[in-house]
Each structure stands twice: as structure tokens, then as C-alpha cells.
Curated annotation (Swiss-Prot):
Record GO terms (molecular function): structural constituent of ribosome
Gene expressing this chain: rplQ
Gene3D superfamilies according to UniProt: Ribosomal protein L17
Sequence similarity: Belongs to the bacterial ribosomal protein bL17 family.
GO CC annotation terms, alphabetical: cytosolic large ribosomal subunit
UniProt KW Cytoplasm keyword: no
UniProt keywords, alphabetically: Ribonucleoprotein, Ribosomal protein
Organism from which the protein derives: Shewanella halifaxensis (strain HAW-EB4)
Source taxon at top rank: Bacteria
SUPFAM superfamilies reported for this sequence: Prokaryotic ribosomal protein L17 (SSF64263)
Pfam families: Ribosomal_L17
Protein name: Large ribosomal subunit protein bL17
Length: 130
């Protein structure tokens, strides 16, 4: 029985799922909007929102925690220099999920997940994780 087990399995083992969400979190921080399936977008919220909350208070310890979760120095830099100050007064809800129809190949429900208050010039990046 799966009582009280949170999170979606997404037909992957735990290391694959962890690596996929680490890569997707880096992509959304880098590009501020990505296109993926609705289920992956809803799970990605649970990874990205704590990272942004961590970035709201800049310290060496928090930067090391963020690096441990993302393994990307460029992403950590953007988190603490741009996103942390941008969301300083927002108590949560840093992401928005916009549904965008069905995928052509298998009719999977697709969605854009974006950071709230992003500059409008940023273009969407397709998610290649399958």
C-alpha cells in the first residue's frame, strides 16, 4: 500500500527521478520557463520553490546547500543574485503552471512552468526529458 507516500513515481527509479528534477530545476532557474508534462511540472514545484526560498537569505551556508541540490555554480549564482532579491517580499508561490494542450506523439497533457514576474523577453525552452 502507498499510504502517506508523497510525490509521483513517474515510472522512474529514485536516482533517475532525482537527476531529472535536478536538471529541470537548473533549466527553470536558467531560462525561467520550460515546457514539460503537467505531472512533471507539478512535481518540479516541490523542488524549485524551496530553492528560491533558500536564496532569499544570502549566506555561504545557503549557497553550499543550493549547490548540493543543483550541482551547478552558474545556477547558484543566478539564484542568489537575481531570483532571491526578486522574490524577497513574496512569501511563496514563485512558480506558475500554464496548461498548453496535448503532446503530438502520445497525447500527454503538456504545460509551461514559469517563474512569476519574469521578464517577458524570455523564450520557452522545450523539455527533452522523457
Amino acid at each position: 500500500m502507498r499510504h502517506r507516500k508523497s510525490g509521483r513515481q513517474l515510472n522512474r527509479n529514485s536516482s533517475h527521478r532525482q537527476a531529472m528534477f535536478r536538471n529541470m530545476a537548473c533549466s527553470i532557474v536558467r531560462h525561467e520557463v520550460i515546457k514539460t508534462t503537467v505531472a512533471k511540472a507539478k512535481e518540479l514545484r516541490r523542488v524549485v520553490e524551496p530553492l528560491i526560498t533558500l536564496a532569499k537569505s544570502d549566506s555561504v551556508a545557503n549557497r553550499r546547500l543550493a549547490f548540493a541540490r543543483t550541482r551547478d555554480a552558474e545556477v547558484v549564482g543566478k539564484l542568489f543574485t537575481e531570483l532571491g532579491p526578486r522574490f524577497q517580499d513574496r512569501p511563496g508561490g514563485y512558480t506558475r503552471i500554464l496548461k498548453c494542450g496535448l503532446r503530438t506523439g502520445d497525447k500527454a497533457p503538456m504545460a509551461y512552468i514559469e517563474l512569476v514576474g519574469r521578464p517577458e523577453a524570455a523564450e520557452a525552452v522545450e523539455d527533452t526529458a522523457e
